[in-house]
Amino acid sequence: MNKNGKTGLNSSLLLLSCLFFTGFTQAQYGTQSGEWLSYGGDTGSTKYSPLDQINPDNFVELEIAWRWTSVDASLPLDALREDNPDIQIGNFQATPLMARGTLYIITALNQLAAINPLTGETLWTHNPESYLSGPPINPLSYHNRGLAYWSDGEKERVLAGTHDGYLISLDAKTGIPDPDFNGGRVDLNIGIPRATRNNLD
């Protein structure tokens, strides 16, 4: 076999190997056991669940099991708007996480909550009061796309970025700020010279 033939064969084998491992990796994606551990479902952001209890045949039979009222509704919004007229709670864009039998959610005003998925009962809430710091430091105003969940098999943490530039970490079971995470939050503005609160420039 000439040199060109060997090169072509090697290239073909390399391509087949890449396709094989890519297919194998993709097969590992997808949520497991109904859990939704990331914004897109899994680390591959497949947004896919293999659960099949709900299908086109029984979709019309679905009924509302419970409703959940956002904890933002319990805030004195009129009083808050006197200091910050831009506050709003209508931009709800978060995707709830489902981890180890609990739903986790973040509201438009950065309040976090854990919810029993069977009953809709609120298990705990955490209010970092980021809305008291003034307008969000991001240009997208008051909304949040979601949370992150982390576990080492024993400890469980829920993490979220806030409008005023902090990253908070809470115990997923209790909602208590993580003492090993700088008391529960770190300042993301540190080390970024042009990033200052109340200034979008």
What residue spans do the PLM features occupy?
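Bacterial N-terminal signal peptides
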Residues: S11-G23
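Extracytoplasmic beta-rich repeat domains
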Residues: W68-T95, T125-D152, D180-D201
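Repeat-blade elements of multi-bladed beta-propeller folds
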Residues: W36-G40, Q88-Q111, N138-Y166, N199-D201
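Bacterial N-terminal signal peptides that target proteins for export
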Residues: N2-L13
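Boundary at the C-terminal end of the N-terminal hydrophobic targeting segment
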Residues: T25-A27
